[in-house]
Design a protein with these regions (language model features):
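ATP/NTP phosphate-donor binding region
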Residues: 1-108
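C-terminal charged capping/lid subdomain of soluble metabolic enzymes
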Residues: 1-2, 6-7, 306-390
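N-terminal low-complexity or amphipathic/hydrophobic leaders
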Residues: 24, 37-49, 182-186, 350-360
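Non-transmembrane, aqueous-exposed alpha-helical and coiled segments at domain scale
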Residues: 79-87, 91-105, 253, 257-261, ...
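A short, small-residue-rich loop immediately preceding and capping a beta-strand
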Residues: 96-124, 128-137
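A glycine/threonine-rich phosphate-anchoring loop and its flanking beta-alpha core
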Residues: 128-224
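Long, charge-rich alpha-helical interaction segments
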Residues: 214-228, 232-235, 371-390
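Active-site segments that bind and position negatively charged phosphate/pyrophosphate groups
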Residues: 216-329
Length: 390
């Protein structure tokens, strides 16, 4: 367990994460890390099995700790189909059944992948009371250490509170070989911390919500670290990947420490989730989450800039002002590194903002503008500004 003493009203922040290893060749430490377990159930997809799962299986077989595996095929989503497949394969389906006993369970679930695989295994782990860990395949999102699983169910996407992994293994050499768009997506996910933390401060001051200065400052510093190192992504430097993953650990633990996703997401994530739901409803494969977050971050930043220019509330103006340099840095990075904008139609951008305000009961700039009867005008302004870049 990781403990973090703090001056906020919580006093002590705790997360059940035992250990994380971020370095070149980290996968080789897997047998030692899982020393206390003997029946490891591995979950991966077709791509992550080839990238990392095959080696993980070899290492665990060598020390007699491997039980069996579940490989999820096709475009894997964090939905009932994926969760059901992981549950069905929890015990080797080929194993002989004993009608006088319940199905034997593995003593550890090893997720091999990034966002979706981690989310599915986290939820199964929590529901069944089986500890789990993750071997990360790409620095594509910041939720490795978080305690929530974004899940598609009942026609929406919601984050279900679960637990953190016990162990996180991030082999930077393996991660550096991930598709370039996934590397950009990880950076894009971190850009949302600037608007997300500002939304959190807005909720503290205008909705009387709990706020932790220490965690917020650590998350901003982690986002800065990722932004500074992001320019080296094209070179696929292991050191660059290591720094980015260290930033991810801070934001993931921030979510676990506070018991909610405030330290890592705000209006930009809700807009991104709205776009993702639109894709699912159309029967299309969702875009990379982090790229949608970076695009939504630009939209939210435009709304905050306009609010800064128009508001007569001096406290609000001062609050927004300290984030303006961050917004400028994000926009510069997106332009210079040519981050893809996955949603390009103005009507789809607007529809995402309109839907987002109803998607989650979380106080953000969207709620503030709605209460001021100004959301539609600000949304149209932000979309027009972003479309100037297309």
């Amino acid at each position: 367990m990781i403990e973090h003493r703090c001056n906020c009203k919580m006093g002590v922040h705790r997360a059940p994460l035992e250990k994380y290893i971020i370095r070149k060749g980290a996968i080789e430490s897997l047998p030692e890390v899982l020393g206390e377990y003997s029946r490891v159930y591995m979950v991966c997809d077709d791509n992550t099995y080839e990238a990392l799962g095959k080696r993980a299986e070899e290492l665990l077989l060598q020390v007699g700790k491997f039980s069996h595996k579940c490989i999820l095929h096709g475009d894997v989503l964090p939905n009932s189909e994926s969760i059901g497949n992981v549950l069905i394969h929890l015990n080797d389906p080929k194993a002989e059944a004993d009608i006088f006993r319940y199905s034997p369970k593995p003593d550890f679930i090893l997720a091999v992948g990034s966002g979706v695989i981690n989310d599915v295994c986290r939820l199964v782990s929590y529901r069944l009371g089986i500890p789990y860990g993750i071997c990360g395949s790409a620095p594509s999102m910041d939720g490795y250490a978080s305690a929530g699983s974004p899940t598609l169910f009942d026609g929406t996407k919601a984050t279900i509170k679960c637990t953190t992994p016990q162990y996180i293994i991030a082999d930077t050499e393996v991660m550096s070989r991930a598709p370039y768009e996934m590397l950009l997506a990880g950076i894009g996910d971190m850009f949302g911390k600037y608007t997300g933390i500002l939304d959190w401060e807005l909720a503290r001051d205008y909705n009387n919500e709990y706020f932790c200065e220490t965690i917020a400052a650590e998350v901003i510093a982690a986002a800065d670290l990722c932004l500074e190192n992001g320019y080296e992504l094209e070179a696929r430097s292991c050191k660059c990947i290591e720094n980015i993953m260290q930033g991810f650990m801070v934001t993931g633990l921030g979510m676990a420490f506070t018991g909610n996703s405030r330290p890592a997401s705000g209006s930009e994530h809700i807009i991104a989730h709205s776009w993702e739901l639109d894709c699912v409803e159309r029967g299309e494969k969702p875009n990379l989450h982090g790229l949608e977050v970076s695009e939504a971050t630009l939209l939210v930043a435009y709304m905050y800039r306009l609010l800064y220019a128009e508001t007569e509330d001096m406290h609000l103006k001062t609050l927004i002002e300290k984030y303006l340099p961050y917004f400028d840095s994000v926009e510069k990075f997106c332009r210079q590194m040519k981050l893809p904008l996955p949603v390009t139609r103005p009507d789809e951008m607007l529809a995402g903002i309109r839907r987002a305000v109803h998607l989650r009961d979380r106080y953000t700039i969207l709620f503030y503008l709605r209460d001021q009867r100004a959301l539609e005008r600000y949304a149209e302004y932000a979309v027009a500004k972003l479309c100037e870049r297309l």
